[in-house]
Structure formats: C-alpha cells, structure tokens
Amino acid sequence: MAIRNFSGQRMNPGERTKALLQGQTVDRVGLFLFARGFCARNTGVSLMEFYTDPKANLEAQIWTAQMYGNDERLKFGFASSIAWDFGGEIKMPITEFDQTPMVVQYPVQSEEDGWKLEIPHVKEAGMVPLNMAFCRLQEKEGLVKTISIGAPFMNAANVCGLEKLLKWMYKKPDLAHHLLRLVTDYGIGLARYWMETFGPESIEFRTSTPTSSNQVISPKHFKEFSLPYLKELHEKVLAMGVGYFYTHICGDQNLNLPYYRDVPFGDPGIASFGHEVDLTKAIEFLGDKCIIVGNVEPRLILMGSPDEVYEASKECIEKGKKAERGFMLGPGCELPPTSPAGNVWAMRKAIDDFG
C-alpha cells in the first residue's frame, strides 16, 4: 500500500522529500512526524506487535502517514536496539503504561565484559533480521529503505549503560574508547550490509545523538568521545555511495553545535533538533549543510491544547522557512505514543495555514 497524495496536495510525501534533497521547490513545508508508537496506537496495533512484526509496523506507519500527510521516510526499530544486537536483553512493551522497548540487561556488566566484547555477526544480530524484513517490504512498496545505525556514543551507552560509560570516560578512558571503536565498526558493517543488499539508491541511513546532549556531557567530552566516532561513521558510510544521512541532534546541544560543522551529512543531509535548540541557531550552524527539521516540544504535543500546538508550530514554521536548504516541521523528539490526535493535526493545520 503506497502512500498516496494527501487530498488537494500537488506532491506526495516521497516526491516532496526527494525535491527537498535535490534543492527543488516544494508545494508546502514538509511534515516530519517522527512517529513510532503513535502509529501503532493510531491504527489499533499493539506496541508488542508493532515492534516485532515488520508488516504490521509498516502498515501502521503508512496509514498514519496517509492520515496526516507525513513526509518522513518510515523506519523500523527503537533507540536502544543495539543492546539486543550485542546480546543484551530487551523487554518489549506489553502493558498500557509501556511506550517503547527497553533494555533490562546490558551486554556489558563489568570492565571484563567490556574488554571481551566482540562485534556480532551483522546479518544475524538482534533486531537486524526484522529490520531487513521491514526494508524488503519498503522496497516492494517503492519506498525509500531506512535503517538506523545509531551514533557511536549512543550505541556505546546502550551496550554498557549510560552510567557506566560516563564513569569510564573519567576513570577508564581506554575502555570507553574501546567500546566506541567496536560500535563504530559495527555501524559501518551494518551500513555495508544494507548497501550490498539494496545498492546506494533509495537508502536513508540514520544516526541519533541523545546521550551527547549537554544535559549529559560537556562540549569537551563531546569533542573527545562523541565527535570523532560520529564523524568517522558518516565519512565511511557516505564514501560507500549513499547520498545523505538523517541525524537527530537530541536534547540541549547548543554548546556542541560548532562541532557538528565538522560532521559530513551529505549534500544536503537532514538534521532534526530537540526543542531545547532554537531553530534560528540550528539554521545558523547547519542550515547551509542540512534540511532542518523541528522542533515543537513533545511535552506540549502530549499535554497541551491544539491551540498551543498550533501556535508553537506556527513559530517553528516562521523560523524554519528561512533555512537555506529547506525545512520540515516536526516534534523535537519522537512523537509521544499517546499524543492526542487533535494536537498532531494542529501541526498539520499550521502547515496548511502558514507553510
């Protein structure tokens, strides 16, 4: 089931995003819903099924994209999946209060575990077979294949736990760098597997940097422990022939923004930002390199009124339309699964009225 034109729109989501990436004029500001669990709840699919059944997952995302006119390229998975890939234990969402899969046991429990850790066989690791099945379904539907290869600092945190990684940065920096080396090489291998399977056309690779926010680490530690590995990952994957990266720069990363200038994203890439970063500042640092996405506060979408979401979306659009390489409106992080439909629609209405 392909994503058709939203009623009254000249372009469909695939055409609109492709035009942005090619530097062409689009008919309206794009909508980047950043929606996972919301798609499940929106279509009556359980979160357990959504995160374990690629077909049900894709259908839920397509129906939701059709409903709201979502221009985001659809993706399978969840933020901490690399813990599963490296042999950790994941708990799938099974109760009404669960929002997403979570790690219940990290692969690395001790320093000894860290030094003994090995890169898993990429084709068989954890969630990879499910992700590959999802991308094969995307291929059948004529959609761009998407795969999140994380970002090394986030992936290392999901291998040993963020608290341990932060402690080892100070007390055992060699061990921290060892884990970062392993997950970087794993991400490159995962990208190579996708490229060998599908070729460089119609693939979107994704990275995300929530654990690199200044709410977690300083700019000094970002420069030492996060930036070099993220830069290497992007450089080596782009050298394989893929066109661009989509990167979510999550949380308060205002002090890190100058360093992101050194990261290649493609020409252009796509970069989304947490609500803690003003879009004007995001455009200042990356607007010449990336299509900018953002950044309505997720809390507001979950707990605010439609009028409040509408006004916040209007403010984002007015700032974002000044981006040199283009702009898409979206939440500042994943759309909360229990967001009221009226609040999500308010974002789309703001695009219709101001974008």
What is the meaning of each model-derived region?
Residues 42-83:
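Segments that shape or occlude catalytic/ligand-binding pockets
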Residues 1-41, 45-50, 71-75, 94-96, ...:
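Active-site loop segments of alpha/beta catalytic cores
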